[in-house]
Amino acid sequence: MAHGPRYRVPFRRRREGKTNYRKRLKLLKSGKPRLVVRKSLNHHIAQIIVYDPKGDRTLVSAHTRELIRDFGWKGHCGNTPSAYLLGLLIGYKAKQAGIEEAILDIGLHPPVRGSSVFAVLKGAVDAGLNVPHSPEIFPDEYRIRGEHIAEYAKMLKEQDEEKFRRQFGGYLVKGLDPEKLPEHFEEVKARIIEKFEGEGARE
């Protein structure tokens, strides 16, 4: 282990790989709310957070579990289509709370072009949230709608039905044919839009 008079022990969250303090300071200096996006293997979470000397405050949040509970999502919650839908949801929630703009905070996630964290950003922007970005970082519509998943499911079903049923068992148990994922995506997207832009939302 490094030692000596000039050695400084990093902050605990830096040592644990949870916080990049240099990047965090840059985000805080903007003075804008942060659109914080985090992902695990099976889920995504998005929050609008503002800095407070006593501790960050969460203004609104959304979790992919809400897609299942409130909008009937039957697909996997760790993929690109669900990430986009989560972004759409957090974007509408932010607008409903009077939040018009934010800056993206993906923490220690690598900024890979077309990744699911940027699918969340795409959804939030489509909902009307103003977040500085370059359009080149977004996944294309083919991946956002889950066309790649549907095509893979079709190929796998034709080549090895047993493997197909193992890999897509979660879809099948819920009554969703993975080949119909793009259509299902559009249905859930429409439900989210209807909730926030429909007649009931304006009353």
From Swiss-Prot:
Protein name: Large ribosomal subunit protein uL18
Family (UniProt): Belongs to the universal ribosomal protein uL18 family.
Gene3D superfamilies in the cross-refs: 3.30.420.100
Keywords, alphabetical: Ribonucleoprotein, Ribosomal protein, RNA-binding, rRNA-binding
Subunit organization: Part of the 50S ribosomal subunit. Contacts the 5S and 23S rRNAs.
GO BP term, example: ribosomal large subunit assembly
Record SUPFAM superfamilies: Translational machinery components (SSF53137)
Summary of the function given for this chain in its UniProt record: This is one of the proteins that bind and probably mediate the attachment of the 5S RNA into the large ribosomal subunit, where it forms part of the central protuberance.
Annotated organism of origin: Pyrococcus furiosus (strain ATCC 43587 / DSM 3638 / JCM 8422 / Vc1)
Pfam families hit by this protein: Ribosomal_L5e (PF17144)
Cystine bridges: none
InterPro entries tied to this protein: Rbsml_uL18_euk
Transmembrane segment boundaries: none
A Gene Ontology molecular function term of the record: 5S rRNA binding
GO cellular component: cytosolic large ribosomal subunit
Database matches in CDD domains: Ribosomal_L18_L5e
Keyword Cell division: no
